[in-house]
């Protein structure tokens, strides 16, 4: 029915892709392809019942709040925010959505995967005994970099390369590794209270690769004391080619071990 993007080039290219898709007969938005920073408002106000928020996540809290104010059901891709202020805004908007009876879905597909659901249930039912530690990884290759185009503003360049700027992306832990962290939190039925870690840029440090790190290593503690008895989650995420790759979650128990993914 309608679609939009901050950049007109992106909006038009995506419309062309959908129009050439095998389900092209379902695409009926030729006159409702919007662009500009306010494109989300035009899409939401175009007469839709549900809106899919799949832009770079730095905009997500503002887009979600407007959709809820206009009474729309929402599917939004993870992550839902990139910082504390955005997260608090999102939580307040979600209270409004619940009060209005609106349906809200988030792109944590593992939560809906029958294999994950069954594995998590078995671990929680004691299949490997008491969980004593967790490991999770999103170690893989470096994402795309889109070159600057002549006449492109700095804002347009950053939106086009949103993954490499923290105000739009939130960095690797927030943008991708959140999938694996969510699985561990789901298994534990809790959130870590303490964390310590390190990160930096060893390979991805050129002038066109922004400010996000290419590796992080974090130790999370499910408990209130660093030195007390607690379950610890060891987390690794990295974008460096030619080294160990894994996108996975693992649970170590008092009676066994589970590869969750």
Residue ranges and their predicted role:
Residues 6-10, 40-41, 57-59, 81-83, ...:
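Solvent-exposed loop/turn segments at secondary-structure junctions
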Residues 49-50, 57, 61-112, 126:
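Beta-strand-loop-alpha-helix segment that lines the small-molecule cofactor/substrate pocket
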Residues 100-105, 110-210, 224-228, 241-250, ...:
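Predominantly a Rossmann-like dinucleotide-binding segment in NAD(P)-dependent oxidoreductases
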Residues 1-25, 113, 184:
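N-terminal Rossmann-like dinucleotide-binding module
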Residues 1-5, 32-35, 52-54, 75-76, ...:
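Structural recognition of the beta-strand scaffold that forms the well-ordered cores
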Residues 13-17, 62-66, 86-87, 116-117, ...:
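Short, solvent-exposed loop/turn and secondary-structure capping segments
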């Amino acid at each position: 029915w309608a679609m939009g993007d901050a950049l007109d080039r992106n909006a038009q290219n995506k419309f062309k892709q959908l129009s050439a898709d095998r389900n092209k007969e379902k695409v009926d938005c030729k006159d409702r392809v919007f662009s500009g920073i306010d494109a989300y408002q035009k899409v939401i106000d175009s007469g839709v019942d549900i809106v899919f928020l799949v832009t770079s996540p730095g905009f997500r809290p503002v887009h979600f709040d407007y959709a809820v104010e206009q009474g729309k059901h929402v599917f939004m891709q993870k992550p839902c925010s990139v910082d504390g202020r955005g997260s608090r805004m999102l939580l307040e908007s979600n209270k409004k959505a619940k009060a209005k009876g609106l349906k809200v879905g988030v792109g944590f597909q593992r939560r809906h995967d029958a294999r994950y659901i069954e594995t998590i249930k078995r671990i929680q039912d004691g299949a490997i005994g008491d969980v004593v530690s967790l490991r999770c990884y999103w170690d893989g290759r470096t994402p795309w970099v889109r070159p600057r185009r002549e006449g492109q503003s700095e804002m347009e360049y950053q939106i086009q390369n949103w993954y490499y700027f923290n105000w739009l992306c939130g960095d690797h832990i927030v943008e991708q590794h959140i999938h694996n962290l969510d699985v561990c939190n789901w298994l534990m039925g809790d959130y870590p209270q303490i964390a310590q870690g390190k990160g930096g840029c060893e390979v991805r440090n050129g002038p066109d690769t922004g400010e996000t790190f290419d590796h992080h290593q974090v130790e999370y503690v499910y408990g209130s004391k660093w030195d007390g008895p607690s379950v610890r989650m060891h987390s690794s995420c990295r974008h460096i080619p030619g080294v160990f790759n894994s996108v996975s979650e693992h649970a170590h128990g008092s009676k066994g071990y589970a590869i969750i993914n």
